[in-house]
Amino acid sequence: MNIKFDMFVKDSNSIDSEELLNNYLTLNVVSQELLIQNAQKPLTPLSIEIGKTRTINKNIKSKLNFIMPSFCEYYELEGNYILYFKKLKIFEDFIIYKDQSIPISNQMEIKIGKGKVLVNGKKISIKDEEIKNNFIRDLNFLSSIKNFRNQYSHGNEIEAVESISKKENSINSLVIPTFIKFLGEIIIKTKDTIKFKNLMVLSDNFNILDDVIYQVENNELNLKNSKNSVVYKSIKKSIPIYLLSKVFEHTEFYILEKNNSILNFFCKKRIEDFNENSEDKEFNSTSENDSHESSIDLKCSSEVSQIKIERFHEYVSLFSKCISKNVDINHKNDKGDTALHNTIKNLKKESGPMVAALLSCGANANIRNNKHKVPLHFAIEFGDESIIKILLAFGAKPFLEDSISFSERDPGKIYKELNKSGQVLKILYEIGVITKLFDNFSVLQHVKTFILLEILFQNSMNILKSDIFSSILNNIFNQNIVRFKLIIQNLKEPPLSKFKKIEKFDRSELGKLIGKGANGKVYELHYNFGGVEKHCAVKEIKVDKYRVGAVLKEIESTALSQSPFTVGIYGYFEDEKNNFLYIFLEYCPNGNLFDIINKEKMKSFDEFFSYAFGVVHCTHDIHSNPKGALIHRDIKASNFLVDKNNLVKIGDFGTARFDCTLNLSSLKNGAGTVCFQAPEASRGKATIQSDIYSLGVVLFELCGAIPYKNYNYFFPFGDLKYLRVASAVSNYLRPILHPVIPQPLSDLIYSMLNHNEYDRPTSFEVFQKLKKVQEDYESNKEEWNSIFNTIDMKEDQQFHHERQEKVALMIKKKYLLTRPITESLVNHYDNIVFNIDYSISLNF
């Protein structure tokens, strides 16, 4: 029993484009305009019979019945069918006639009779004379280009297509085979294929057909009892879907696509790894603007020069054809991605030739998708310096302020990707600049340095025109001059690659004493580490032999988190005989921040922001450690050191813990300086947000250090040194800033001192807000800086006197408070424990 399909196509002017899109098998693949374009002229209703198939799925039948007439016609030929395409081209080597394949060869015997055609002795009955003539013409044409398939399968698609297009009688109708004897094998191997709705995916899965065809042609594959087998039935069910997939895969349908999704798929599919089996070649391509190509002049590092010139030119040619057919090469899909986004995202390091071709044909390198990512984001995320160079050469902007995080992805996976991304990242990892690309702040801060360092280390500045390179430097200077100085310094003095145990050391080698604290003494020393001389600060600690392991573990945790924002730890020496431990640290000659803000008088808020951004950078840096966020638990001004370049670094990780559930119990042990502890930390539950509270106290200190006119109180409650505590925790009191402090800054600090840890901003949010505060300052510098000269001494003293009275009143009522606000009040009382009545709620 034959199944008949009665189909027709309406006039293109009357096509219901909405209905076409709603019913189309691959919804987001073809635009309305394209469907209308392909349905050109009204067709007479035609009848199709598909062999003796009885098992065609009704759903498939309806879809086939609907979609195929939009760009091809059907004709019945004795239980078989022929598709006559209007514009599309497809090339196969078989005709199926009554379940038998008729191979098309260079020497094909075709006999024409009245209403009959004999092909290699097999009869085909054709009643319509016009159909018969078209059929014969196509057979002759196919036999004359038998070498097409070999040409096509060896990567010469363009030559193959051009060889056909040059023929006088170009094909407009071709016979489509069903491949009955071997298609079933493919269905079995890709048994889930028929479940897919996207023809592009189907097309990919059918690529294996080339190998199977070869086996059939060489009699290497035989299917016994095929008509009654599961394979045979699977074939029959799959034919309509298979035909559709082949139409998409091998035709010019790609470059007719208006909404760019097929172009994106082409970019994904037609690529060859430019590093694989290729010799180094320089490539140049210059063409007129009319052809939508811009000049390429990339004579640079080997990574770029490995791009195959042949493939590059082929892609340029293909994309030029796309543009000539009004395809928008910068069109966005529903995710906002362009062809350039998808090429880099899907192909990663294999995308070189395609990226260069897209850019040379006018692709915009600075278009953002719906997640605000530009192509440069993906190139950096996948760590491919070659693609970064290509993008930069075509005008990709290296500053990415509006970038978002990679937080939707597993940070561990991204970290592994970064570790596999080549020599540049290895260098950056040693320096510690680019180890955390997966979080917001790191993308903002490290993208620029990644590009700069990559260029500097590879000595490839010639890749960029001077104006582009100048733009990079200007943006880096304007946006983060502190970090840029730090990077340059690291380039001059590369740090030691690993924290290690020092085998030989004599205490007599120590230089002058430069510091002393409750935990030990600090000496200056110049020490040679395997040929690298370092100016060190050596911390001498008296350690009980039973605690050495625990102390070393803490030191190791610090070493693991080393970056340009942490005081470097070069190594340690254990004096087992005298129970001393010597920690070799980076020397910071400008001392700690506490001493600086006590001894020096700030003249403007420029100095405040310089230090404020420094402490925020440092805090965020340890919070975004790739091995797990590191909770410092003892953030205070004296633990921020300032190096010879006036860059702020964080040190003293003696109480630090990595933030993970396995270590939660270790965070319950009280540690840190009492006056800087957050409410929850004082209860033995330290979190990352506890560090934010302490950071807020440091910013508070920076504000308190502003020398108002005749102002002698460098810190809040500065004259009440007998108090061991000056602010409450939880829902008690919090520090009070002087009212002269500008509102944007005081709002930020108060948000960091929120009694509820979950309402405090993250370190990155602190950075963002501080940047906005700085912008407010930049636009009102005169007003902000005027507070240095406008505070009257009486008014200033009255403000502090009122605060003193309130504190004294609280003491009188026996409301025990938990912490003084400044280090100066508890320099010698770091280990004092206070009893706190948390049932009492106090407010000013």
Swiss-Prot record:
ANK repeats mapped onto the chain: 335-367, 371-400
Residues that hold ATP according to the record: I514, G515, K516, G517, A518, N519, G520, K521, V522, K539
GO BP terms, alphabetized: signal transduction
Pfam families: Ank_2, Pkinase
Coiled-coil residue spans: none
Enzyme Commission no: 2.7.11.1
Keywords: ANK repeat, ATP-binding, Kinase, Nucleotide-binding, Repeat, Serine/threonine-protein kinase, Transferase
CDD domains attached to this UniProt entry: PKc
Active site, renumbered: D634
Reactions performed catalytically: L-seryl-[protein] + ATP = O-phospho-L-seryl-[protein] + ADP + H(+); L-threonyl-[protein] + ATP = O-phospho-L-threonyl-[protein] + ADP + H(+)
Class in the EC hierarchy, top level: transferase
Protein kinase domain ranges (all copies): 508-773
GO molecular function list: ATP binding; protein kinase activity; protein serine kinase activity; protein serine/threonine kinase activity
Keyword Repeat: yes
InterPro entries the record matches: Ankyrin_rpt, Ankyrin_rpt-contain_sf, Kinase-like_dom_sf, Prot_kinase_dom, Protein_kinase_ATP_BS, Ser/Thr_kinase_AS, Ser/Thr_Kinases-Pseudokinases
Keyword Transferase among record annotations: yes
Family, per entry: Belongs to the protein kinase superfamily. Ser/Thr protein kinase family.
Protein name: Probable serine/threonine-protein kinase DDB_G0267566
Species per Swiss-Prot/TrEMBL record: Dictyostelium discoideum (Social amoeba)
